[in-house]
């Protein structure tokens, strides 16, 4: 017979949500930083070099 799961406490739920949000925020900052360096031409990454059409 199916038994309902125990309820997760608010503090545990909030902790997990905060962890997820912090990870997402960190990745967003990295992406923005890479976008800025690519747009200014200072990127050292091989995959994101802008070729000039001269």
Swiss-Prot record:
Keywords: Chloroplast, Plastid, Ribonucleoprotein, Ribosomal protein. Its main location: plastid. GO terms for cellular component: chloroplast; large ribosomal subunit. It holds the Pfam family Ribosomal_L32p. It comes from the Eukaryota. Residues 31-42 have a biased composition (Low complexity). GO terms for molecular function: structural constituent of ribosome. Residues 1-20 have a biased composition (Basic residues). Residues 1-54 are annotated as: Disordered. GO terms for biological process: translation. It is found in: Plastid, Chloroplast. Disulfide bonds: none annotated. The keyword Lyase does not apply. The keyword Chloroplast applies. Belongs to the bacterial ribosomal protein bL32 family. PANTHER family: 50S RIBOSOMAL PROTEIN L32, CHLOROPLASTIC (PTHR36083), LARGE RIBOSOMAL SUBUNIT PROTEIN BL32C (PTHR36083:SF1). This is Large ribosomal subunit protein bL32c. It comes from Chlorokybus atmophyticus.
